[in-house]
Protein backbone atom coordinates (compact mmCIF):
# COMPACT_ATOMS: atom_id res chain seq x y z
CA UNK A 1 0.00 0.00 0.00
CA UNK A 2 2.84 2.40 0.84
CA UNK A 3 4.50 1.69 -2.50
CA UNK A 4 1.22 2.34 -4.28
CA UNK A 5 0.83 5.67 -2.48
CA UNK A 6 4.37 6.68 -3.33
CA UNK A 7 3.90 5.66 -6.96
CA UNK A 8 0.75 7.74 -7.18
CA UNK A 9 2.33 10.75 -5.49
CA UNK A 10 5.45 10.65 -7.61
CA UNK A 11 3.35 10.26 -10.74
CA UNK A 12 1.30 13.36 -10.03
CA UNK A 13 4.32 15.43 -9.08
CA UNK A 14 6.02 14.52 -12.33
CA UNK A 15 2.86 15.26 -14.25
CA UNK A 16 2.84 18.75 -12.78
CA UNK A 17 6.42 19.60 -13.71
CA UNK A 18 7.82 17.07 -16.15
CA UNK A 19 11.03 15.03 -16.10
CA UNK A 20 13.98 16.79 -14.59
CA UNK A 21 17.74 16.76 -14.09
CA UNK A 22 17.44 18.50 -10.73
CA UNK A 23 20.25 18.15 -8.14
CA UNK A 24 18.70 15.28 -6.17
CA UNK A 25 19.66 12.57 -8.65
CA UNK A 26 18.51 9.67 -6.45
CA UNK A 27 15.03 11.13 -6.02
CA UNK A 28 14.81 11.90 -9.73
CA UNK A 29 15.94 8.45 -10.81
CA UNK A 30 13.58 6.74 -8.40
CA UNK A 31 10.65 8.82 -9.57
CA UNK A 32 11.43 8.23 -13.23
CA UNK A 33 11.48 4.48 -12.62
CA UNK A 34 8.09 4.70 -10.93
CA UNK A 35 6.72 6.74 -13.80
CA UNK A 36 7.95 4.20 -16.33
CA UNK A 37 6.40 1.43 -14.26
CA UNK A 38 3.05 3.25 -14.32
CA UNK A 39 3.31 3.89 -18.05
CA UNK A 40 4.00 0.22 -18.65
CA UNK A 41 0.96 -0.75 -16.58
CA UNK A 42 -1.14 1.55 -18.75
CA UNK A 43 0.36 0.15 -21.97
CA UNK A 44 1.73 3.57 -22.89
CA UNK A 45 4.67 4.00 -25.23
CA UNK A 46 6.52 7.31 -25.50
CA UNK A 47 6.98 8.61 -29.04
CA UNK A 48 7.85 11.92 -30.68
CA UNK A 49 7.18 13.94 -33.82
CA UNK A 50 9.23 16.76 -35.31
CA UNK A 51 6.77 19.49 -36.24
CA UNK A 52 7.02 21.63 -39.37
CA UNK A 53 8.46 24.37 -37.15
CA UNK A 54 11.35 22.09 -36.24
CA UNK A 55 10.11 21.75 -32.66
CA UNK A 56 9.71 18.33 -31.07
CA UNK A 57 6.39 17.11 -29.71
CA UNK A 58 6.57 14.12 -27.39
CA UNK A 59 3.47 12.04 -26.76
CA UNK A 60 2.26 8.83 -25.15
CA UNK A 61 0.20 6.31 -27.08
CA UNK A 62 -1.40 3.08 -25.98
CA UNK A 63 -1.51 -0.11 -28.00
CA UNK A 64 -5.22 -0.19 -28.75
CA UNK A 65 -4.95 1.07 -32.32
CA UNK A 66 -8.29 -0.60 -33.14
CA UNK A 67 -10.13 1.59 -30.65
CA UNK A 68 -11.65 4.98 -31.45
CA UNK A 69 -8.96 7.66 -31.03
CA UNK A 70 -9.11 9.85 -27.93
CA UNK A 71 -6.81 12.87 -27.69
CA UNK A 72 -6.15 13.92 -24.07
CA UNK A 73 -4.68 17.37 -23.40
CA UNK A 74 -3.07 18.38 -20.10
CA UNK A 75 -3.24 21.73 -18.36
CA UNK A 76 -0.80 24.48 -17.41
CA UNK A 77 2.20 23.13 -15.48
CA UNK A 78 1.27 19.58 -16.41
CA UNK A 79 2.27 17.04 -19.02
CA UNK A 80 1.18 13.76 -20.54
CA UNK A 81 1.56 11.93 -17.22
CA UNK A 82 -1.47 13.72 -15.82
CA UNK A 83 -3.39 10.96 -17.62
CA UNK A 84 -1.06 7.99 -17.12
CA UNK A 85 -2.97 6.27 -14.32
CA UNK A 86 -6.44 6.94 -15.68
CA UNK A 87 -5.24 5.69 -19.08
CA UNK A 88 -5.48 2.07 -17.96
CA UNK A 89 -9.18 2.61 -17.22
CA UNK A 90 -9.63 4.09 -20.68
CA UNK A 91 -7.92 1.18 -22.40
CA UNK A 92 -10.93 0.64 -24.66
CA UNK A 93 -9.91 3.73 -26.62
CA UNK A 94 -6.89 4.52 -28.78
CA UNK A 95 -5.18 7.08 -26.55
CA UNK A 96 -2.96 9.88 -27.82
CA UNK A 97 -1.59 11.94 -24.91
CA UNK A 98 0.88 14.68 -25.91
CA UNK A 99 3.20 16.99 -24.06
CA UNK A 100 2.08 20.36 -25.38
CA UNK A 101 4.83 22.59 -26.72
CA UNK A 102 6.37 24.31 -23.70
CA UNK A 103 5.76 21.40 -21.32
CA UNK A 104 7.08 17.98 -20.37
CA UNK A 105 9.57 16.52 -22.81
CA UNK A 106 8.44 18.63 -25.77
CA UNK A 107 10.41 21.63 -27.03
CA UNK A 108 10.19 24.84 -25.01
CA UNK A 109 10.91 27.79 -27.32
CA UNK A 110 10.57 31.17 -25.60
CA UNK A 111 9.43 32.84 -28.82
CA UNK A 112 6.48 30.52 -29.55
CA UNK A 113 2.79 31.32 -29.41
CA UNK A 114 1.21 29.25 -26.63
CA UNK A 115 -2.41 30.31 -27.01
CA UNK A 116 -5.11 27.76 -27.73
CA UNK A 117 -5.23 28.27 -31.50
CA UNK A 118 -1.47 27.78 -31.87
CA UNK A 119 -1.47 24.65 -29.71
CA UNK A 120 -4.52 23.39 -31.59
CA UNK A 121 -2.64 23.71 -34.88
CA UNK A 122 0.29 21.69 -33.51
CA UNK A 123 -2.03 18.96 -32.25
CA UNK A 124 -3.74 18.76 -35.63
CA UNK A 125 -0.35 18.34 -37.25
CA UNK A 126 0.35 15.45 -34.87
CA UNK A 127 -2.97 13.77 -35.59
CA UNK A 128 -2.58 14.24 -39.34
CA UNK A 129 0.85 12.63 -39.20
CA UNK A 130 -0.70 9.63 -37.48
CA UNK A 131 -3.71 9.46 -39.80
CA UNK A 132 -6.09 10.18 -36.92
CA UNK A 133 -7.34 13.68 -37.73
CA UNK A 134 -10.89 12.55 -38.51
CA UNK A 135 -13.38 10.86 -36.19
CA UNK A 136 -11.45 11.99 -33.14
CA UNK A 137 -12.70 12.35 -29.57
CA UNK A 138 -11.01 15.18 -27.65
CA UNK A 139 -10.63 15.83 -23.93
CA UNK A 140 -8.67 18.30 -21.87
CA UNK A 141 -8.09 19.58 -18.34
CA UNK A 142 -7.80 23.28 -17.48
CA UNK A 143 -5.72 24.92 -20.24
CA UNK A 144 -6.14 21.65 -22.11
CA UNK A 145 -9.89 22.17 -22.01
CA UNK A 146 -9.56 25.55 -23.71
CA UNK A 147 -7.37 23.96 -26.38
CA UNK A 148 -9.96 21.20 -26.80
CA UNK A 149 -12.64 23.82 -27.44
CA UNK A 150 -10.39 25.58 -29.96
CA UNK A 151 -9.72 22.27 -31.71
CA UNK A 152 -13.39 21.28 -31.91
CA UNK A 153 -14.37 24.74 -33.15
CA UNK A 154 -11.82 24.58 -35.96
CA UNK A 155 -12.59 20.98 -36.97
CA UNK A 156 -16.22 20.46 -35.88
CA UNK A 157 -16.94 17.79 -38.50
CA UNK A 158 -13.98 15.72 -37.34
CA UNK A 159 -14.58 15.89 -33.57
CA UNK A 160 -17.06 13.26 -32.42
CA UNK A 161 -17.21 14.29 -28.76
CA UNK A 162 -15.69 16.74 -26.31
CA UNK A 163 -14.65 16.16 -22.68
CA UNK A 164 -13.97 19.31 -20.66
CA UNK A 165 -12.42 18.82 -17.21
CA UNK A 166 -12.26 22.03 -15.14
CA UNK A 167 -11.73 23.87 -18.40
CA UNK A 168 -10.00 27.20 -18.78
CA UNK A 169 -11.00 29.78 -21.37
CA UNK A 170 -14.49 30.71 -20.16
CA UNK A 171 -13.20 33.78 -18.41
CA UNK A 172 -16.37 35.88 -18.27
CA UNK A 173 -17.47 33.59 -15.42
CA UNK A 174 -14.92 35.42 -13.27
CA UNK A 175 -12.11 34.16 -11.08
CA UNK A 176 -12.30 32.44 -7.68
CA UNK A 177 -11.66 34.43 -4.51
CA UNK A 178 -8.46 32.45 -4.02
CA UNK A 179 -6.93 34.16 -7.08
CA UNK A 180 -8.30 37.65 -6.64
CA UNK A 181 -5.41 40.08 -6.81
CA UNK A 182 -3.03 37.49 -8.29
CA UNK A 183 -0.47 38.85 -10.75
CA UNK A 184 2.51 37.40 -12.57
CA UNK A 185 4.57 38.47 -9.57
CA UNK A 186 2.49 36.66 -6.94
CA UNK A 187 0.54 33.96 -8.80
CA UNK A 188 0.48 30.64 -6.88
CA UNK A 189 0.88 28.73 -10.15
CA UNK A 190 4.27 30.33 -10.86
CA UNK A 191 7.08 28.73 -8.91
CA UNK A 192 10.01 30.86 -7.73
CA UNK A 193 11.06 28.87 -4.67
CA UNK A 194 10.68 25.45 -3.08
CA UNK A 195 8.10 26.88 -0.72
CA UNK A 196 6.05 28.12 -3.70
CA UNK A 197 5.90 24.57 -5.01
CA UNK A 198 4.85 23.12 -1.66
CA UNK A 199 1.99 25.64 -1.47
CA UNK A 200 0.99 25.08 -5.10
CA UNK A 201 0.80 21.32 -4.59
CA UNK A 202 -1.79 21.77 -1.84
CA UNK A 203 -3.57 24.60 -3.65
CA UNK A 204 -4.29 22.73 -6.88
CA UNK A 205 -5.84 19.68 -5.20
CA UNK A 206 -8.45 19.45 -2.46
CA UNK A 207 -6.98 16.26 -1.02
CA UNK A 208 -3.44 16.04 -2.40
CA UNK A 209 -1.75 12.63 -2.34
CA UNK A 210 1.22 12.21 -0.05
CA UNK A 211 4.58 13.21 -1.49
CA UNK A 212 7.88 13.29 0.44
CA UNK A 213 9.25 16.79 0.82
CA UNK A 214 12.60 15.72 -0.63
CA UNK A 215 10.89 14.76 -3.88
CA UNK A 216 8.86 17.98 -3.90
CA UNK A 217 12.11 19.91 -3.63
CA UNK A 218 13.50 18.17 -6.71
CA UNK A 219 10.51 19.14 -8.82
CA UNK A 220 10.43 22.63 -7.39
CA UNK A 221 13.86 23.22 -8.89
CA UNK A 222 12.63 22.30 -12.37
CA UNK A 223 9.71 24.69 -12.10
CA UNK A 224 12.05 27.42 -10.90
CA UNK A 225 14.26 26.79 -13.92
CA UNK A 226 11.26 27.22 -16.25
CA UNK A 227 9.70 30.17 -14.44
CA UNK A 228 10.26 32.68 -17.25
CA UNK A 229 8.60 30.49 -19.86
CA UNK A 230 5.81 29.55 -17.45
CA UNK A 231 5.12 33.24 -16.83
CA UNK A 232 4.94 33.93 -20.56
CA UNK A 233 2.57 31.03 -21.17
CA UNK A 234 0.34 31.96 -18.25
CA UNK A 235 0.15 35.56 -19.43
CA UNK A 236 -1.06 34.33 -22.82
CA UNK A 237 -3.63 31.81 -21.64
CA UNK A 238 -5.38 34.01 -19.04
CA UNK A 239 -6.45 36.36 -21.84
CA UNK A 240 -7.31 33.56 -24.27
CA UNK A 241 -11.12 33.44 -24.18
CA UNK A 242 -12.73 30.55 -26.06
CA UNK A 243 -16.39 31.41 -25.45
CA UNK A 244 -17.09 32.57 -29.01
CA UNK A 245 -15.46 29.46 -30.41
CA UNK A 246 -17.54 27.31 -28.06
CA UNK A 247 -20.66 28.56 -29.84
CA UNK A 248 -19.54 26.57 -32.88
CA UNK A 249 -19.64 23.43 -30.73
CA UNK A 250 -23.25 24.25 -29.94
CA UNK A 251 -24.07 24.89 -33.60
CA UNK A 252 -22.69 21.51 -34.63
CA UNK A 253 -24.25 19.82 -31.58
CA UNK A 254 -20.98 18.10 -30.71
CA UNK A 255 -21.68 15.81 -27.72
CA UNK A 256 -19.96 17.38 -24.72
CA UNK A 257 -19.24 16.16 -21.19
CA UNK A 258 -18.27 18.81 -18.65
CA UNK A 259 -16.69 17.59 -15.40
CA UNK A 260 -15.71 19.86 -12.50
CA UNK A 261 -14.40 19.54 -8.97
CA UNK A 262 -16.60 21.47 -6.56
CA UNK A 263 -13.52 22.50 -4.54
CA UNK A 264 -11.60 23.87 -7.54
CA UNK A 265 -9.62 26.94 -6.42
CA UNK A 266 -8.12 27.63 -9.85
CA UNK A 267 -11.24 28.04 -12.01
CA UNK A 268 -14.64 28.75 -10.46
CA UNK A 269 -16.95 25.72 -10.32
CA UNK A 270 -19.77 28.10 -11.30
CA UNK A 271 -18.15 28.21 -14.73
CA UNK A 272 -20.22 25.14 -15.58
CA UNK A 273 -23.31 27.37 -15.71
CA UNK A 274 -21.73 29.55 -18.38
CA UNK A 275 -20.60 26.54 -20.38
CA UNK A 276 -24.08 25.01 -20.20
CA UNK A 277 -25.54 28.29 -21.44
CA UNK A 278 -23.15 28.42 -24.40
CA UNK A 279 -23.25 24.67 -25.15
CA UNK A 280 -26.83 23.61 -24.28
CA UNK A 281 -26.27 19.97 -25.21
CA UNK A 282 -23.48 19.63 -22.64
CA UNK A 283 -23.86 17.09 -19.84
CA UNK A 284 -22.49 18.54 -16.59
CA UNK A 285 -21.11 16.52 -13.67
CA UNK A 286 -20.03 18.28 -10.47
CA UNK A 287 -17.70 16.08 -8.41
CA UNK A 288 -17.90 16.41 -4.64
CA UNK A 289 -14.76 17.15 -2.60
CA UNK A 290 -12.54 17.28 -5.67
CA UNK A 291 -10.20 20.08 -6.75
CA UNK A 292 -8.81 21.17 -10.10
CA UNK A 293 -7.59 17.81 -11.45
CA UNK A 294 -10.35 15.18 -11.10
CA UNK A 295 -8.55 12.64 -13.29
CA UNK A 296 -5.80 12.56 -10.65
CA UNK A 297 -7.75 13.16 -7.45
CA UNK A 298 -10.71 10.88 -8.25
CA UNK A 299 -9.61 8.85 -11.22
CA UNK A 300 -12.05 5.94 -10.76
CA UNK A 301 -15.11 8.18 -10.67
CA UNK A 302 -13.77 10.38 -13.46
CA UNK A 303 -13.12 7.39 -15.72
CA UNK A 304 -16.52 5.85 -14.95
CA UNK A 305 -18.28 9.11 -15.78
CA UNK A 306 -16.50 9.37 -19.10
CA UNK A 307 -17.12 5.76 -20.09
CA UNK A 308 -20.81 6.15 -19.24
CA UNK A 309 -20.92 9.24 -21.46
CA UNK A 310 -19.30 7.35 -24.32
CA UNK A 311 -21.63 4.38 -23.84
CA UNK A 312 -24.62 6.67 -24.31
CA UNK A 313 -23.10 7.97 -27.54
CA UNK A 314 -22.55 4.43 -28.76
CA UNK A 315 -26.17 3.52 -28.01
CA UNK A 316 -27.41 6.52 -29.99
CA UNK A 317 -25.61 5.53 -33.17
UniProtKB/Swiss-Prot annotation:
**Sites of N-palmitoyl cysteine lipidation:** 19
Topology versus the membrane: Lipid-anchor
Record-annotated active site: 74, 142 (nucleophile), 270 (charge relay system), 292 (charge relay system)
Location(s), subcellular = Cell outer membrane
GO CC terms for this protein?
cell outer membrane
Q: How does activity depend on temperature?
A: Active at temperatures close to 0 degree Celsius.
- Coiled-coil region: none
Q: Does the keyword Hydrolase apply?
A: yes
What keywords is this UniProt entry annotated with?
Cell outer membrane, Hydrolase, Lipid degradation, Lipid metabolism, Lipoprotein, Membrane, Palmitate, Signal
- Positions where lipid (S-diacylglycerol cysteine) attaches: 19
**Main enzyme class:** hydrolase
EC numbers for this chain: 3.1.1.3
Q: Where is the AB hydrolase-1 domain?
A: 69-296
Catalytic activity of the protein: a triacylglycerol + H2O = a diacylglycerol + a fatty acid + H(+)
User: Which BP terms in the Gene Ontology apply to this protein?
Assistant: acylglycerol catabolic process
Q: Which GO molecular function annotations are given, in alphabetical order?
A: monoacylglycerol lipase activity; triacylglycerol lipase activity
- Give the signal sequence positions: 1-18
Q: Lipoprotein among the record's keywords?
A: yes
Q: What is this protein called?
A: Lipase 1
